[in-house]
Amino acid sequence: MIVHFNQSLQTTRAGREGSRETFAELAGRVVESLATLPQQGQVDVRTLSTLRIHLDWIQYRANFRDPVIVRRAIDAQGRMLALAEIAIDLRQVEAERLTPLLADAQRALGSHARLPRVGPARGRRPAAGIPSAAAAPGATVGIPSAAAALGAPVAPSENGPVALDDFRPLRDGLLWEFNRLFWHRLADWEAASGRRFEAALPTGKSDVEHPQAIADSVGDFWTLLRELEARSQLPAEIFAVEIGVGSGTRARLWLDRFKALDEQCGSAYYSRLKFLLGDFSPRTLDTALATMGPHAPIVSVVAMDAVNPLKTLSFLRFKTLYVHVSNVYDNLPFDELVRRDGRLYVVETRPYVSAATARHLVTEFGIARTELPGLVRRLLSVGPEAFDDHDRGMAFWRCVWAGLRLEERLRAIDNGDDGHVPPGLTLQHLDDLLDAAPYDIRFHLSRGAAESFANTLPLLHPRGYLQVQDIFVPAMDEYRQGFKGPGKLDGSLVAWVNGALLRAVGARAGYDVHFAPFRYRPGSKVTILFTTQRD
């Protein structure tokens, strides 16, 4: 048996009566519990030789994981492999439930039945205003069995969870349909929740609105314009683009500062500026444009697919001096890959709701258990209008999202198979990433971010640059130092972006990619990516 410590041993959580418990102390309890299982005859010791225990620390209070989960591995044809993993989220798991949870997980590895397990997760609460059986005391859910990992149908028992879809790579999962619905129906969600989506962020607002960060960004851009003007290379029209506009506050503050600096220096750049706001959500664009105030005459809004800005903005190819992207890449489709003992696997997930959540939905909305997957599909297709009453449709959507969980399994990737490689990259690029990675690793393949990045670079003027504010993993080794998502936001999701992958994409396009810490707020997880063109 191999135990993986996927977090700093000094990480702490609040224990009972206000005490602090470290990751190391909690890990010690896991080892003690594991040691008792063979003594109690609750595990076949022959299974331990291929078992891996992963000790995680999922920092997102809302997420898609139960405290203890089982992962099995299959080959490309779907046949069971020997590799097995038990993953434990030490931030959620209750100490007194640890031994029975591990016993259930061990039995599930060799069982073809779904075994009950006591919940809920430690500290988990339903979203505000949502009655959620997923967080009810004494709720029970099931540990996925070996049969479940192979994709066998979920048992129809009233005590079992309800699968909402088949196993698929993360990039093809239902999560992205929920995400798309959220951004298309943002106004409906905010009305139902009673707060703007920014309130779901850890600090209640985005770091991109920090005034000093904006002032420095404006100063850097103004300096570039001055240098180009000194060389008689400044275009008559100065194009700048912001992708991922949020409420529009950041763009408004940036334009306020740019105009003030321009007037102070008498440089007359503001009158030549053409500022474009691009976003996926029409409602977001309308809100952002209304925020522009006196800058509206120089601002245009463009609805675009964030994965392919070039498709909409092709008229700006090689013309844009400044592109700013904020909090977009962490909300684009990705895969997760795993390397174990030199073999590569893709993580496949199956969305489900627990038996307790299913019972609540059946009772609250007057539907049959067997109708749940179909009704969720209809919700994702047409929105809350899947119900005759809009408010009930919204309540159903919010309750399903609050209770949504993911089963996981590992599907082996055959040598030479490139179906998991993002467009624009090759197996060689992935091999280069893995060469710089720890031997055993689980990491994001940020497909959507890589495509968006590659489809933004052609917009840049030869002296232009791209600046991205997001949560990045700049080096592959950092994937062993903490959980990088996905986390669950209020209606949406977030995952850290593989910065090492973007560095490879940039190199292919002739750009160096740099990462700088966001120094304007202590403790911020945000990193600033910026590009420089190679000579």
Which positions does each model-derived feature cover?
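Rossmann-like AdoMet
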Residues: 2-129, 149-239, 247-320, 337, ...
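Class I S-adenosyl-L-methionine
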Residues: 2-50, 54-57, 319-535
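Conserved S-adenosyl-L-methionine
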Residues: 244
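Long, intrinsically disordered low-complexity tandem-repeat segments
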Residues: 129-150
